[in-house]
């Protein structure tokens, strides 16, 4: 088993890699690791006039299912609830259109450069 601190570090690196990728695609960061009593929003971005709630999922290997499959119905519900709370608390974004994206990253950590670790950006991965 991989120690928790190593897993957390790999997760932070994957999030930083995803953020850099999205910014290169023209999205702007609103919030990162926004916490509430119902969960966490990894990245809240702005794509044009759309608020994008991005769930970043990293899996070293897909022995128990891949990164995309880990965003199941239960996780989607938690993300929707957290997004609703975000829009209530940060009300300046409440009237903007919203969507939920998933960034799925699989492979060995430490080489998040896009050539050896594939990144899969799923726009509008699910509906609220």
From Swiss-Prot:
It comes from the Bacteria. CDD domains: PoNe_Nuclease. SUPFAM superfamilies: Restriction endonuclease-like (SSF52980). GO terms for molecular function: nucleic acid binding. Belongs to the UPF0102 family. PANTHER family: UPF0102 PROTEIN YRAN. HAMAP family: UPF0102. This is UPF0102 protein PSPTO_4420.
């Amino acid at each position: 088993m991989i120690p928790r601190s190593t897993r957390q570090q790999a997760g932070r690196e994957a999030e930083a890699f995803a953020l850099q990728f999205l910014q290169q695609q023209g999205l702007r960061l609103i919030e990162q690791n926004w916490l509430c009593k119902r969960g966490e929003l990894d990245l809240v971005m702005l794509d044009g006039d759309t608020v994008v709630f991005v769930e970043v999922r990293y899996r070293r290997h897909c022995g128990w299912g891949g990164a995309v499959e880990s965003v199941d119905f239960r996780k989607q519900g938690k993300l929707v609830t957290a997004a609703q709370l975000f829009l209530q608390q940060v009300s300046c974004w409440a009237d903007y259109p919203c969507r939920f994206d998933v960034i799925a990253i699989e492979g060995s950590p430490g080489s998040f450069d896009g050539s050896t670790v594939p990144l899969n950006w799923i726009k509008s991965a699910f509906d609220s």
